[in-house]
């Protein structure tokens, strides 16, 4: 494994990738969200410290007769223990959580999505976003 391969992986080139796969795309507040996070190893073995699933929304705020879009995280869940992903290895980490009852309904410009973030020490952290209908 060359120095350059490790260097490129640390800046995201040839690094591990992440893809979150949900059981479905439409939910109601209080529903169980089931899915799997697929981590695919890159050109070098890397230590995966943490994987987080977080629920986000974008909503409209009105102030002084002006509208602005705001983003916020509703919930954040850690789904793994630290592990090493090997070159070209594929690992699937299952997860499940209950969609909070105060999750806003999606309509118009109001959006809800599940973001996945992977913490890789000394490297660019891969991310994934999956929009859902509520």
Q: Where do the model's predicted regions map?
A:
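N-terminal onset of structured domains
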Residues: 1-134
């Amino acid at each position: 494994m060359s120095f350059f391969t490790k260097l490129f992986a640390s800046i995201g080139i040839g690094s591990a990738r992440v893809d979150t796969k949900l059981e479905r795309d439409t939910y109601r507040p209080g529903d169980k969200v089931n899915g799997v996070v697929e981590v695919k190893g890159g050109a070098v073995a890397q230590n995966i410290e943490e994987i987080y699933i977080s629920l986000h929304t974008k909503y409209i705020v009105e102030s002084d007769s002006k509208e602005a879009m705001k983003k916020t995280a509703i919930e954040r869940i850690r789904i793994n223990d630290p592990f090493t992903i090997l070159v070209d290895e594929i690992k699937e980490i299952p997860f499940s959580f209950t969609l909070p009852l105060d999750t806003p309904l999606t309509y118009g410009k109001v959006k809800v999505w599940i973001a996945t973030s992977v913490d890789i020490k000394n490297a660019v952290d891969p991310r994934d976003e999956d929009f859902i209908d509520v």
